[in-house]
């Protein structure tokens, strides 16, 4: 791509915002020109605003250190005049986020969001680029509702889904799935925390993550849904049930998946072959952040593991293992992904690349 887009990060000081900053530092298509956060950070340089809260392994990007942070709520006009689109990862109440993202869109500024507020707005595409890239075709209908020419909102799905739904998607296309039971084991960075800021998680497991189980049961059906008229209609099946558990791991979500097929079921060999040969629109377009191979299957009985697999293909691949027949369901297996790369900022950057490649920012 010859053109480079000027972008902003709204919610730049939080953990996901910091991850956006590191991913966009040397991005071939996107140039960060604007950083925004709460009024507490506004007026400070990015380095001053983040201070000791910086929690990435790499240092604050040199080209962003001295950018003066704007107020995400009160400087919308100024922000939108400087950028082609924004990435959004703010920590606010859901109704406030929904209103904020619409305000940016109505200022003719596309929003690529990591937030959950608009995931079930009927004409807002919730996209994993390898799985349901065609859902961005709803954007003209959304623009009509908003009364915009350029502005729109596109979102990524919940971080936990991106460990196990990619494994189900290509199976569902060839062998319809009846029901899925999934137990997720989720890293503390999914709550925006580190062990320094959440010492209670050391040597501990918390069997509850607020709202996570509902998201894990509903969001896959929207990803599997279809555009009907001016909205995306969620699929009726498969039926999902989920249990979500917080575990003492810095990064990486793992899902233990049990699956039952409608009628004919594939063999284990067929399932592994489907996974290893699956690719989507992100690979077709050769997007900069896309993994060369999206799904990787491991034959070792003790894989995938957080330490060895979470950074596979720069943290953008999904690792699968332990596929075997089950006594109650047809099969069971384990999936793993990096929750702040594939599951959050990395997935949003990939969505931004898809939208750029398909001409939605022009």
Over which residues does each language-model region extend?
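Charged docking surfaces used in two-component/phosphorelay signaling
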Residues: 189-362
């Amino acid at each position: 791509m010859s053109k480079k887009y000027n972008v902003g990060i709204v919610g730049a000081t939080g953990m996901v915002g910091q991850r956006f900053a590191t991913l966009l530092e040397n991005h071939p298509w996107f140039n960060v020109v604007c950083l925004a956060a709460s009024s507490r950070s506004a007026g400070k340089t990015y380095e001053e605003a983040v201070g000791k809260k910086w929690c990435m392994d790499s240092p604050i990007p040199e080209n962003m250190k001295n950018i003066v942070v704007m107020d995400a709520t009160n400087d919308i006009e100024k922000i939108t005049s400087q950028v082609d689109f924004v990435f959004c990862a703010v920590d606010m109440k859901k109704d406030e986020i929904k209103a904020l993202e619409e305000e940016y869109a109505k200022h003719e500024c596309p929003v690529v969001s990591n937030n959950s507020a608009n995931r079930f707005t009927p004409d807002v595409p919730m996209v994993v680029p390898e799985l349901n890239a065609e859902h961005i075709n709803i954007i003209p209908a959304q623009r009509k509702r908003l009364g915009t020419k350029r502005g729109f909102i596109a979102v990524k799905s919940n971080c936990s889904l991106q460990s196990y739904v990619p494994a189900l998607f290509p199976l569902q296309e060839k062998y319809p799935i009846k029901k899925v039971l999934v137990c997720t084991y989720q890293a503390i960075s999914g709550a925006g925390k580190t062990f320094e800021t959440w010492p209670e998680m050391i040597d501990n497991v918390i069997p509850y993550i607020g709202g996570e189980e509902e998201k894990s049961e509903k969001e896959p059906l929207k990803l599997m849904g279809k555009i009907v008229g001016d909205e995306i209609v969620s699929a009726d099946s498969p039926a999902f049930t989920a249990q979500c558990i917080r575990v003492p791991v810095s990064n990486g979500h793992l899902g233990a998946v049990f699956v039952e097929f409608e009628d004919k079921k594939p063999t284990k060999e067929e399932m592994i072959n489907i996974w290893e040969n699956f690719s989507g629109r992100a690979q077709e377009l050769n997007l900069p952040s896309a993994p060369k191979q999206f799904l990787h299957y491991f034959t070792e009985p003790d894989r995938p593991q957080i330490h060895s697999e979470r950074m596979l293909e720069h943290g953008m691949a999904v690792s699968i293992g332990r596929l075997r027949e089950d006594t109650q369901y047809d099969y069971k297996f384990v999936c793993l992904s990096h929750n702040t790369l594939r599951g959050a900022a990395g997935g949003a950057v990939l969505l931004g690349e898809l939208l750029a490649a398909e001409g939605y920012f022009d």
